[in-house]
Amino acid sequence: MSVRRTVAGPIRIRGRGLHSGSPLTLRIHPYGEGIVFRCAGESVRAHPGNVTGTFRATTLGGISTIEHLMSAFAAASVSSALVELTAPEVPGLDGSARGFADAIAEAGTTVLGPAPQRVVGGTVTVRGGPTSIVIRPGTGRWSCTYDLGERWPGALTVRATLPGEYGAAVAWARTCVLAEEIPQARRAGLGGGLDSGSVVIIGPDGYANPVRAPDEPARHKLLDLIGDLWLAGVPLDLMDVTAIRPGHSTGVRAAALLARQWPEDAVR
């Protein structure tokens, strides 16, 4: 039986915005009506229909970079929480979801009651150029390929059974960037909260800084995909997912297709 789950107690996390670099505080409160982000009087529900941007991050309304926190929520099966922010961006922390996952584990979770069963009714496929995401009813077998073609490191593939292996295989993987993209990202005002310890820099023939695993970029892409798909609220262990070069745009499109299976769960 599916259940609605929230955090068992309040959580406070301080950090800097992943892209803005501005200091901010995030507070997570027990809540009973889905996942809601709130900042400066704006409240927006976590749902693919409320996504307003997918460039380098997933943005809900005016609140950006929600995917790492959403990924940690998915792994802990947290389907309801009130997330309050002092600035319209989720903290970047170390570039991964580990800080969020650890904070949720420390606070614990509690069951609110039964929830409508979110079962994938058939194969969901999203394609766009070299990118593809295929979702089938399943038991939590996930595969993600990070593929730069002829550019180093070529193709990296990671597989995990979720949510059980999330902490060991996914949560700690940091965001990644191509070395040649850094100047452009800085000019666009992105990555201001990242440093060499919180991002994997991919050079033309090797990593430009220490990595936590040789396939860390693929693991982070899986982390992001988990967060984007959690917008549809399907438990991780009820899907088998195969993704090749996923990005936030295709991840949110896939979440939207999943969410269409439950029209009663309308955007609000």
What is each PLM-predicted segment?
Residues 1-268:
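Short acidic-hydrophobic catalytic motif
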